[in-house]
């Protein structure tokens, strides 16, 4: 289910985030060797953490957010989160007509736009494949005609089959709420609610 925000519920403007922190978690063991080198060994897959703080909410805004979070906990679903700072809409067009060759893996992906896309992504933009929930960041971009070469972090979690389509806009992080067992707020003497924050972890 989608975490409510002003895009989904414009009648509740307070659901816009006061601050949001996207954290790159890349679990790794580092060992300092006698020759001065540092050996790195990955111990788990990379995942994104998201920390969200809300401004003071009016009672109807708080009640709506609280009910959505309780519904998430009741159903055991995922929370899909959109981060507005990444909604640049630099790439537009018909992504359904884009082809992604099969057999690709690693940290780069090649796609053929077939002339259906306008604009170009930039380093730091988000990227996703239509068939898998993992979110990537673009680290480099180059093109030759209709062929785009996109460098990604982290490495692709899947090997492409040729059925995937690229996603550049409206990218949702699929997450689990990590502080749901102690979620709370403070009712102020002016009738607003404060101290509301969410700690989320990408979950595939």
Swiss-Prot record:
Q: Where's it found, cell-wise?
A: Virion
Instruction: Look up the domain of life of the source.
Output: Viruses
> What UniProt keywords apply to this chain's record, in alphabetical order?
Late protein, Viral tail protein, Virion
Q: Which GO terms describe its cellular component?
A: virus tail; virus tail, baseplate
Q: What does this protein do?
A: Forms the simplified baseplate, together with the p132 collar protein, the baseplate tube protein p140 and baseplate hub protein pb3.
Subunit text: Homohexamer. Interacts with baseplate tube protein p140 and baseplate hub protein pb3.
Record text about domains: Possesses OB-fold domains probably serving host adhesion properties.
How is this protein named in the record? Distal tail protein pb9
Natural source organism: Escherichia phage T5 (Enterobacteria phage T5)
The lineage is: Viruses, Duplodnaviria, Heunggongvirae, Uroviricota, Caudoviricetes
């Amino acid at each position: 289910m989608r975490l409510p925000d002003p895009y989904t519920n414009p009648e509740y403007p307070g659901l816009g985030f006061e601050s949001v922190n996207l954290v790159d978690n890349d679990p790794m063991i580092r060992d300092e060797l006698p020759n001065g080198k540092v050996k790195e060994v990955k111990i788990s897959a990379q995942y994104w953490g998201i920390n969200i703080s809300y401004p003071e909410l009016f009672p109807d805004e708080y009640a709506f957010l609280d009910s959505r979070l309780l519904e998430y906990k009741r159903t055991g679903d995922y929370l899909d989160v959109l981060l507005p700072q990444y909604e640049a809409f630099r790439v537009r067009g018909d992504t359904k007509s884009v082809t992604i060759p099969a057999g690709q893996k690693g940290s780069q992906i090649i796609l053929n736009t077939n002339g259906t896309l306008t604009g170009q992504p930039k380093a730091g933009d988000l990227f996703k494949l239509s068939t898998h929930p993992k979110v990537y960041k673009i680290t480099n971009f180059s093109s030759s005609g209709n062929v785009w070469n996109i460098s990604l972090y982290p490495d692709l979690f899947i090997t492409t089959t040729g059925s995937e389509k690229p996603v550049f806009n409206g990218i949702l992080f699929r997450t689990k709420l990590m502080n749901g067992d102690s979620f709370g707020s403070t009712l102020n003497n002016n009738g607003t609610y404060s101290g509301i924050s969410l700690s989320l972890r990408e979950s595939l």
